[in-house]
Amino acid sequence: MSDAVSITGEFMPARLARQLLSIQAQNQQTTRLDGWFLIQEIRMHALQALRASETDHPNVIVQAKLFTAVCAQLTLTIRPDEIFAGTQDDAFARTYALINPEFRVETFAGYCDPMAVYGDITPAPELGLSAERIERVRDFWAHEPFAQALREAYAGTGAELAEVAYFTEQVTGHTVADFRPALQYGLLPLIDAARSGAQEHTGARRDFYLAAEIALHAALTIGDRYAHLAAEMAKEEADPIRKSELERIAYTAGCVLRRGATTLYEAMQAFILLWMAMALEQSPNPYAFSVGNLDRILQPYYEQHAIEREVAVELTRQLLALFNVGDRNWAISQNIMVGGRDVQGNDLTCAMTYIILNAFYRSNYPQPALSVKIHAGTPDAVYAALEPFFITPGSLTPSFFNDDVLFPLLARKGIAQQDWPLYAIAGCQEPLIMGKESENTTNSWLNLGKILELTLHGGKSAISGKRIGLSYEELGLDPQQPIRDMAQMKAAFWKQLDGLLPRMEAAANACTRAMALLPIPFLSCFMGGLDSGVDLRDVTAQGTPYNASGCLIHGLSVVADSLAAIHTLQQTSPEALAELPRALLANFDGVEALRQRCLSAPKYGNHLALPDQLAAEIVAGVSRRVYGLRNPWGNPFLPDWSTPSTHLLYGYWVGATPDGRLARQMLNYGIDPSAGMATHGLPPRMLSMHTLPYQEMLGGYASHLGLEPGMLQAAGERGFITALREFVIDPLFGFTGGTGGYYVYFNIDSAQHLREILARPKELVPSGIYIMRIHGTFVNFLDLSPAIQEDIITRLDAQSTRLVGKAQRA
């Protein structure tokens, strides 16, 4: 067969592979992302025109009309070699700090200022983007109600937010839409449902249904415009093969959103157009939109119209290219899942599971993230398909989620049994129900290290000296000797935390109410809105079946180890307790012997009774307190023990702590031991982690294992993945009996090798791409800032994951 694509729709794998290389090369040359600004400008003009018309529309309809203007006016392109129409590039700016080489822990201030994005666009007079034009748009939106509401939300937080005792933010993205009905039937039935809803309801619900109909029609406009563009390009195309490809794009883009898909190609094209519309609606920077089980979504179309497996792999690689935004993959933390089981324990692996895994392995790009659902009955063939990821240096390594533990956790959250298999990951590791759950996942962030510091110093910051928390007297401590024993300090810690949590709750809810000023009727149609008649962001009623707000909790092992150190000093050298507050304020300067005693105290991660019990107690106590907070819907905040590189940022604002950690050093990552503190090897580390109450971590948690490349090869000759299962996955997840966790990700490399790569990148990585993980997402190690590169190297922490370790109980 020739290297061609026929009018009837045959694809040639070799051509598809070459086209993908061309697309990736074009991405690498895309150093400007200006579409988001043009979207803001289109919205500005549309809003000004609406106001000039003197027609008073409800806000949800206003937002639908602004979305319509964007879909109708934004410039569309089909680049050379693209076989699908659609992009999410225009939704993102060159903003995400952790993949920006200019990122500095010392100066990062979060994403709470919606006007900060305008600092991420460089004026380009040759493109018509003058500084004056940028400022005009920025100034317009700075005076709109949303920006004003956010400023008011942050106005009362002061030093407690500036020094991150807690942090709050408005949440965009971080959602898993259910596009399956639109893929199968098209948008016309949804439009009919919206129209019927408007006829059957009055008031706010009628307004929503009217807005939904407008927004769904706007998405059809995108498909129609691409169809027209592709048809016009086909008329001018001399190459018959490319002409045929453009004609296919024109035909499919023009009809698939109306009638639904019947082939794998059509399903992918429909998905891309829907994804584009969803991203445009929340531009700029809707981070962590995620897909769910892509294998289950696409399997019906693979079965319905048979194609060669190799063609399916290459088409999937083309689909994955949607998630590669610009030269640094700026659309961060977009997650795709495969695998898993149903509620009866039956494995749900299908042909598309293996096709998607193969596509990811061949492409090996920083985005999107890949997560694999596993369980005790996961087939050996799935593990065999995963092995290449783990034995290839610089290859992405999927994260694992344990259905056997997650299903009971979902039950505790109040999720109906039939919805358990629908859980998906919104971004890094937060489990949500596809199409049914709005969790506002990154709404609040809690810094236990700072809470401990404020407790130790009577409410004053060890960094700035500012009064932030409760005083010694309010905590019931003696100002002359506040640290007398562990029990007293622990009680004071809880009291300090209880004093700050209501303030965090209020600030987080203010951000959520601000977001309600920007309804998203298009996405809401795929999140239960057509059933409820309520926008996903509406705080006056609940639009999704499941709703919560998130709280990401930092500093578990720092606090546990610090309390253990206080207890150890109490037992061995009680006179040192009187000296400890001054030593901490001095960053242990001049008292190195005291610091060494603190460092030598028992540490979480070594299977030692005291710190392990303290860690479990902290998880339970903090989680229950966070769960007791309420969002604007009256639903709980879900405790999420995840620290998406923020363990660096939050540690920078924490002074020295009794575990021996110096001021401004990073906190521990997620639920992992502090770097360098788990010295007894992997088995004791896992035993420590088994003591944690995972069922209290209703919002998720983060955990990372850094493995030396040769470690598991030395464990046996049965293959790397077999050894990984036997020595790591099965015991960690409880597949061999006992309790277990439900999430882990790996980096398989050595600190020495990564430092060599940094020293000689062109020689050792000629492709310029070397994939590692930071929290729940892949990154190109060479694109990162020095601070993040060093964090990855430090947390490989080989001594904590060596297989031969002594387990002991103190």
What are these regions (language model features)?
Residues 223-231, 295-299:
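Extended amphipathic alpha-helical scaffold segments
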Residues 2-212, 241-809:
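Conserved catalytic cores of very large enzyme subunits
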Residues 210-221:
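Extended non-globular scaffold/tether segments
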Residues 230-246:
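Short, Lys/Glu-rich amphipathic helical modules
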